[in-house]
């Protein structure tokens, strides 16, 4: 099962969707603007990648955080902020579940055609 997470109006997410469709790869799209980010889902992301790769510090949302929050970025604070503002995550997030019985999953961040080509070869 393949799930692409992001927001529908993000150009990078659109590129990933276009690439997946052009290569006849079926996927489910999870739009953070229409579906809430849950504790469970965010916890799953954190298990697969750490905050240093998940958090988009170049985003407008991050830049708009108060200095107090930016200087107190503990795991709990980040978790709380990302739940409230999922646009703090890098996009898109591509979750591939290879074997649900064995709980084998991979989470890929961002989109580059070469990377997607390597993932799906």
Predicted regions and their residues:
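Local sequence-structure signature of Cys/Sec-based thiol-disulfide redox active-site neighborhoods
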Residues: 1-23, 27-32
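Thiol/selenol-based redox catalytic cores and closely related redox-interacting motifs
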Residues: 35-121
């Amino acid at each position: 099962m393949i799930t692409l997470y992001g927001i529908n109006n993000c150009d990078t997410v659109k590129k990933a969707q276009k690439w997946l469709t052009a290569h006849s790869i079926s996927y489910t799209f999870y739009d953070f603007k229409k579906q809430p980010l849950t504790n469970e889902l965010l916890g799953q992301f954190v298990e697969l990648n750490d905050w240093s790769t998940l958090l988009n510090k170049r985003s407008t949302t991050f830049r708009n955080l108060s200095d107090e929050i930016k200087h107190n970025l503990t795991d709990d604070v980040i978790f709380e902020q990302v739940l409230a503002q999922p646009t703090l995550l890098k996009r898109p997030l591509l979750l591939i579940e290879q074997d649900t019985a064995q709980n084998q999953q991979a989470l890929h961040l961002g989109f580059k055609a070469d990377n997607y080509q390597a993932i799906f070869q």
